[in-house]
């Protein structure tokens, strides 16, 4: 399968042909093309080098993608602003540090970029792409060779109501930083007492942060007001405190605030674990597939969306998909086949459209490898069946 500039419907191919020469196309015709693009069930653009997380920002009519085009020492990052209809890049925001994760505050129109390898957040004005500043979360250390290291960041979750930002740090003895969005200062640093805190989901009504990790207690519940762990949730499957014995690793999570359910993507088993937050028990386990990575919940559709790369030690080639799970009976409503390897998923404000980043394989021994291929962004109309 060729990954370069591949689009999945004939109407999109025609539309993109028009867009390629958009400078000479009358405005009315351009608008007609956008309407066509908005009506298709799936659209894919292979136009981002080093894509990672995606975030939807309806208030500024944009989709943002964090990207790391190069991994050389001292290389920077890029946040690409995309048109949510055509998925064309409309602005490239250059950053001094590599950008992996994204969190968006719709109230202040602020975009927070997780600089994973530098232990920091870059703060961006989402209205114009201006960099407002940087928040150093973990201490940066320079060794004798001049190499800089810092505790890594992972997930960035924003509470717009209280203007607070949560950032996980997935080390063997991991941390969670709670940042005051008004001052850009770290308010609390929380030790989770477990390995690799990675995924996170926030309950806005109850002001509770849920953090997924490995170990004996795969979920910790944090009160952001005082930075204290107020509860833990466990599958009960892990019986040893040795991280190597962890049966699960909840790499990403999503929450159903209305019905008080937590959805955890387990990278170890490739299944979604559903917790009832009322009693803290696992009520359902939904197999998705190898390389399970990201997860989102559409309250409007009562559906859980999960990406999986199809990659494991047993199958390094991998096949990708987005799995859509019924939130009532937990059956699989549909699987959307995607190129390798689906990465991050985000939903539109109305919960009817999914945006997924897809990474190309790096090794030339992979059957889908193509020289100079770029990563993709895919828009999927969930109403399209």
Show the residue positions of the predicted features.
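Gram-negative bacterial Sec-dependent N-terminal signal peptides
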Residues: 1-23
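Predominantly soluble domains enriched in secretory-pathway, periplasmic, or organellar proteins
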Residues: 18-385
């Amino acid at each position: 399968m060729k990954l370069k500039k591949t689009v999945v419907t004939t109407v999109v191919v025609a539309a993109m042909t028009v867009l390629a020469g958009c400078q000479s196309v009358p405005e009315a015709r351009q608008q007609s093309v956008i309407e066509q693009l908005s009506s298709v069930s799936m659209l894919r653009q292979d136009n981002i080098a080093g894509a990672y997380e995606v975030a939807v920002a309806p208030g500024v009519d944009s989709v943002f993608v964090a990207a790391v085009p190069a991994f050389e020492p001292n290389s920077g990052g890029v946040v690409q602003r995309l048109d949510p209809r055509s998925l064309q890049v409309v602005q490239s925001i250059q950053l001094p540090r590599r950008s992996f994760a994204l969190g968006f505050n719709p109230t202040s129109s602020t975009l927070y970029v997780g600089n994973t390898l530098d232990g920091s957040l870059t703060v961006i004005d989402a209205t114009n792409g201006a960099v407002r500043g940087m928040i150093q979360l973990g201490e940066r250390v320079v060794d004798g060779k001049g190499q800089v290291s810092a505790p890594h960041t992972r997930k960035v979750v924003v509470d717009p109501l209280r203007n607070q930002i949560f950032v996980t740090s997935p080390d063997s003895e991991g941390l969670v930083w709670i940042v005051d969005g008004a001052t850009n200062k770290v308010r609390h640093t929380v030790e989770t007492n477990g390995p690799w805190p990675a995924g996170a989901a926030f309950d806005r009504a109850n002001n509770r942060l849920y953090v997924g990790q490995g170990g004996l207690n795969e979920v910790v519940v944090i009160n952001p007001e005082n930075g204290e762990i107020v509860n833990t949730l466990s599958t009960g499957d892990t019986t040893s405190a040795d991280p190597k014995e962890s049966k699960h690793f909840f790499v990403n999570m999503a929450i159903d605030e209305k019905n008080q359910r937590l959805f955890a993507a387990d990278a170890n088993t490739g299944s979604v674990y559903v917790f009832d937050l009322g009693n803290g028990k696992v009520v359902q386990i939904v197999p998705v597939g190898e390389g399970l990575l990201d997860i989102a919940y559409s309250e409007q559709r009562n559906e859980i969306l999960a990406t999986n790369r199809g990659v494991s030690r047993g199958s390094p080639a991998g096949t990708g998909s987005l799995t859509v799970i019924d939130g009532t009976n937990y059956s699989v409503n549909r699987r959307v086949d995607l190129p390798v390897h689906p990465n991050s998923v985000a939903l539109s404000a109305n919960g009817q459209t999914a945006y997924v980043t897809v990474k190309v394989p790096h090794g030339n021994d992979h059957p889908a490898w193509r020289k100079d291929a770029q990563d993709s962004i895919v828009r999927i109309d969930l109403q399209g069946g």
